[in-house]
Regions:
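Catalytic cysteine-centered active loop of the rhodanese-like fold, especially the PTP/DSP P-loop
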Residues: 75-98
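C-terminal accessory "lid"/substrate-recognition subdomains
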Residues: 1-77, 102, 116
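Post-Walker A helix-loop "phosphate-sensing" segment adjacent to the P-loop in P-loop NTPases
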Residues: 98-108
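Recognition helices and adjacent regulatory flanks at domain boundaries
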Residues: 67, 73, 87, 109-111
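Short loop/turn motifs enriched for small/polar and acidic residues
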Residues: 3, 82-84, 113
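Short beta-strand-centered segment that lines the nucleotide-binding/catalytic pocket of NTP-utilizing
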Residues: 106-117
Length: 117
């Protein structure tokens, strides 16, 4: 799930990942009114080395932690990825994390709570 911190952390979140530390496409005029569903926004976010490194670190954490949740009997886990407004960075990362979870053999669903705000 992607979300914007300015609208509150989703109460159903089991894990909250923060991507506000990354460069914000909101401040790029041609990207401001687009979202992480648009490829040029994804390209902008992921063009920064710190975004690639942060994604790798989140993936490493999930590779370790997800089997532990399964072992404890958790059949569903809500991973909430937040940025300021919930339209650019969080959507990009929520999609990337869902792709990674699929590679690990899980069946993630993805929601973008604040994309239309």
């Amino acid at each position: 799930m992607s979300f914007g911190f300015k609208f509150g952390i989703p109460p159903e979140a089991d894990l909250v990942l923060d991507v506000r530390c990354l460069p914000n496409p909101f401040y790029v005029p041609e990207l401001k009114h687009k979202t992480g569903l648009d490829q040029d926004v994804v390209d902008f976010v992921m063009s920064h080395p710190e975004a690639q490194e942060l994604l790798k670190r989140y993936e490493n954490f999930l590779q370790y932690a997800l089997p532990l949740y399964v072992k404890e009997g958790k059949s569903q886990l809500t991973i909430a990825v937040g940025c300021t407004g919930g339209k650019h960075r969080s959507i990009t990362f929520a999609r990337k994390i869902a792709e990674y979870c699929t590679q690990l053999g899980y069946e993630p669903g993805v929601q973008h709570r604040d994309v239309k705000r």
